[in-house]
Amino acid sequence: MINPSKLIEGAMAVYGEENFNKLYGEIIPIDSSRVIEADDNFILDFKGRKLKFIDTPGHARHHFCVWDKQTESMFTGDTFGISYRDLDKENEVYIFPSTSPVQFDPKALIKSIYKIMEYKPQRVCLTHFAAIKPTQKVIDQLIDGIHFVSNLAKKYATENDAELIIQDEMMSYLLKGIEKIGNDELEFCRDRLKLDVEINTQGLIYWQQKISSD
């Protein structure tokens, strides 16, 4: 926030410069005097209501989650993946990882997910979207998804049609997972997931390119 250049770079990689400018305009740095640097286990006390900040890299190196002990809720940002309520079926949820550019790290992400679960949250509050109960089935879905897309990237990232191949494989995987929870409205689901698949694919390819260039 003090120097938003990396944030701008990442957002432009996702949306493209033209769409970025339409959506966000100019990103103005925040004066350092207005910023609290929250290290791992930092406590923010709102007159007795304490929120604990937890370092959770994997989606991005700077990412943190926030633990609210009073409600046993973990605010997970993008670390705990993406889950849409309009894809739910009879209280069954489907969840999948966010691998958007530019700092995806699967090993760190899985470690962060287990770190979240050490708090035994009754609910995880996702940026995309809403609060869900982190059952073992949900956790397994998320971890399996990370392994699947990581292997996709390793297998296809250097192919000429890498983006299209990874998108197709990822979409098929997600639709099969959604079918397993009893949702058979696959055309609606395909449209719902299209943008996520495109953005996640960009992040996976960038991750593999970064590994190759290091």
Q: Which residues make up each language-model segment?
A:
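C-terminal regulatory/interaction regions
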Residues: 151-214
